[in-house]
Amino acid sequence: MKLWLVRHGETQANVDGLYSGHAPTPLTERGIQQARSLGDYLQAAPFDQVLCSELARTQHTADLLLAGRLVPRQIIPSLNEMFFGDWEMRHHRDLQKEDPRNYAAWCKDWQHAAPTNGESFQAFAQRIADFAASLGQYQQRANLLIVGHQGALSLLIALLLQMPAAAMWHFPLAHGCWSLIEQRDDFTTLRVLNSQAQWRAE
């Protein structure tokens, strides 16, 4: 099975440098063009199914990428980005002033601290691990397109490669790029990371 991983297009929150987990934030014009370009890059990819998070920015990206292709879609809540609670749509400079104790704790030990009234990294990692474990149900799908978020997809890559959760930072996913993981005979291989090349069948 091949897992085609795509981060949603650029959003206004990305441009403004804000924490955007579950908060709605629309694609920018650049983000819209990124998604359309991905449709060109992956026009020949034989997707059997597309999985998106509940958040509109992933679904909008999938709409633009697929451009009318009739690919079955499933909304997967566990693919949602980490929930930042009171920090949603806030800049780190503001948090340093307005929530200094909790923000300092988060910066010092992000794997065990949590955003104020938000989701801990441990809970987030478990949610993504549960999704990874559920991929077996899609074995009849040879090519699965997953449109998600920076944190969720980077963490998914690390977990599928049987690496510690903290290794997610080795796999930053850029806007407007596609990545590819292949699972075969109980082995998982990262074939492509952050490509803007036109995919062609081998």
Predicted ranges, named:
Residues 3, 142-148:
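Generic beta-sheet signal
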Residues 41, 82-94, 137-143, 158-202:
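Acidic, low-complexity terminal tails and accessory targeting/binding regions
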Residues 57, 152-153:
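Alpha-helix capping/helix-boundary segments
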Residues 37-101:
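Phosphate-coordination/substrate-recognition cap region in phosphate-metabolizing enzymes
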Residues 9, 150:
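Active-site metal-binding loops of divalent metal-dependent hydrolases
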Residues 4, 74-76, 191:
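General small-molecule cofactor/ligand-binding pocket signal
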Residues 15-18, 101-115:
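Short, basic/glycine-rich phosphate-binding loops at helix/coil junctions
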Residues 4, 10-64, 115-129:
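Loop-to-helix element that buttresses phosphate recognition and phosphoryl-transfer chemistry
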